Amino acid sequence: KFLDIAELSLFNNSLAGINLHGDRFFYVNPLEADGVRRFNHGNGGRAKWFGCACCPPNISRLILQVPGYMYAYSKDRVYLTLYGGSQTTIPLEGTRVKLEQTSAYPFDGKVRLTVQPEKGSKFSVCMRIPTWHDPTNLCREDFIPNKQPKQAEVELSVNGQKTDFKMEKGFAVIKRDWKPGDVVELNIPMPVRFVDCI
C-alpha cells in the first residue's frame, strides 16, 4: 500500500511539480484548482522561484534518492519496488546478484529484468504489482494486497515462458533456481483512466 502511494505521489505530484527548466514549481494541487477559488498562494499555475524556497530543493533531493527506493532485499529475496531503467547488485545469502532493469515505465507497463547471480542459486524475485492495475482497488484503505491479478491484467514470464507466481503483500513472487542471464518480463496493461483528486 505504501509503495503504491509513494509511486502515485512521485509521478503525479513530485515530478509534475517542477517545470522542465527547473525554475517554476507548483505550491498548490492543480488537479483540484477550479479556476474560481484561489488556493494557498492564489496561483493555479507554477510559481516563479523566490528568495527562500524550501519545497523545490526538497523535490530535487527526492529525485536523486529515487534509485535507493527501487530495490529491497532480505536473505533470500529480491524486491523490485519501483520500476524504471536501472542497475544494482544485491548481496543475498550465498551469492551476489546483479540486476538490470529496462523499462519505459510509467509510459509503458513492460518491465524486463535480467538476473545475473554470481553462481546459480535458489531465491525469490518479488515484483510489485501496483494496485492501480485494478481500478476498484486504487489506494483504498481496505485494498487486498494478496489478491491474485486476472491473467488478462498482468503477464509474467521467465526466459520467454509464461510462469506461475504467488501474490504476497502486493508482490508477484517467483521462487526458483536462477542462472546467470535469466530474464524476467512483466507486462502490466496501462489503459488511461480518469482519477479524481479528493
Predicted regions and their residues:
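Short loop/turn segments at connectors of secondary-structure elements within structured domains
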Residues: 121-123, 150, 180
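Intrinsically disordered, low-complexity coil segments
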Residues: 44, 146-152, 159-160
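Functionally constrained cores in energy, signaling, and assembly domains
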Residues: 2, 13-14, 61, 67, ...
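Glycine/proline-rich low-complexity spacer/linker segments in large multi-domain proteins
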Residues: 137-149, 188-198
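A surface-exposed beta-strand-loop module
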Residues: 155-183, 189-198
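Short polybasic amphipathic segments
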Residues: 88-90, 153-156
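Aromatic (Trp/Tyr) and acidic
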Residues: 1-139, 167
